[in-house]
């Protein structure tokens, strides 16, 4: 298993590589605005944060110069497979690689990708979940209180633009007028009592199916993989059982 000491250096490496990649033109940052939107006619509305990125409407294409022609290029068949662009490569781990995201809406946006090709339409493996959890818990919040958020878009319908398995990690700070960096935490605070059964899967009161598993992982890193495999399977069971109950052709999504 990956030691916490090795993982603690990743945010620092990400920052160094990010500066180098932006300066070299191997990564791109797009300015954005955040709007806070609160639900109408609901108790305790969640302050949803909607990020608007006008530049993504039309990504500019610069004319190809002689310098561009010799620039290291991503693998055209699979951008998350070797050979990696040196400025986008943060760290190679055993079965995974840490890469910078080429197109950033938030600074220091990076990815954990499988070394070998695995489809993004498959759920993340227990080993990947355990590693992401370890990366998040070994992350030291910066002076502005930024927290590390990991998210996984499972296939094109949920926003994944690449077919190679990847988990995304970003640093988030609470937006103006918001007390939490992750809006859904407001619902967790109001929907779960401290003494509730920690094994229970929570279904959140939103207009889509959203299930939450609270975590109390074992302190032994060797047992993390098994723990996350079980908790994730409980989430999937909750999703599919509700889909069956509703006779849902979309499998609960």
Model-derived segments and spans:
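Active-site microenvironments that recognize anionic phosphate/pyrophosphate groups
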Residues: 1-124, 174, 178-229, 233-253
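Solvent-exposed loop and beta-edge segments used for protein-protein assembly and interaction
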Residues: 42-44, 144, 161
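Short, well-ordered alpha-helical segments in soluble proteins
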Residues: 78-80, 136-143, 171, 191
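Generic beta-strand structural signal
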Residues: 94-96, 108-109, 146-150, 161-167
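Short N-terminal edge-element motif at the start of the domain
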Residues: 108-149
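Histidine-centered divalent-metal-coordination microenvironment in nucleic-acid enzymes
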Residues: 151-179
């Amino acid at each position: 298993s990956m030691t916490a000491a090795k993982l603690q250096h990743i945010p620092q490496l990400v920052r160094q590589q990010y500066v180098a990649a932006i300066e070299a033109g191997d990564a791109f940052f797009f300015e954005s605005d955040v709007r806070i939107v609160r639900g109408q006619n609901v108790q305790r509305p969640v302050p949803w944060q909607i990020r608007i990125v006008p530049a993504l409407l039309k990504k500019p294409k610069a004319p190809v110069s002689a310098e561009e022609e010799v620039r290291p290029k991503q693998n055209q068949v699979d951008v998350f497979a070797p050979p990696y662009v040196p400025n986008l490569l943060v760290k190679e781990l055993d079965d995974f690689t840490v890469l910078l995201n080429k197109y950033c809406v938030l600074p220091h946006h990076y990815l954990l990708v499988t070394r070998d090709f695995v489809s993004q339409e498959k759920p993340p493996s227990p080993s990947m979940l355990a590693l992401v959890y370890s990366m998040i818990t070994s992350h030291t919040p910066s002076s502005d209180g930024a927290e590390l958020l990991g998210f996984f878009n499972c296939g094109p319908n949920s926003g994944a633009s690449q077919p190679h398995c990847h988990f995304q990690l970003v640093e988030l700070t609470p937006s103006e007028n918001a007390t939490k960096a992750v809006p859904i935490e407001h619902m967790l605070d109001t929907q779960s009592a401290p003494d509730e059964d920690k094994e229970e899967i929570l279904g959140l009161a939103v207009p889509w199916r959203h299930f939450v598993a609270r975590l109390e992982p074992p302190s032994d890193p060797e047992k993390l993989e098994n723990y996350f495999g079980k908790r994730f399977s409980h989430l999937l069971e909750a999703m599919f059982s509700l889909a069956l109950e509703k006779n849902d052709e979309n499998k609960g999504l």
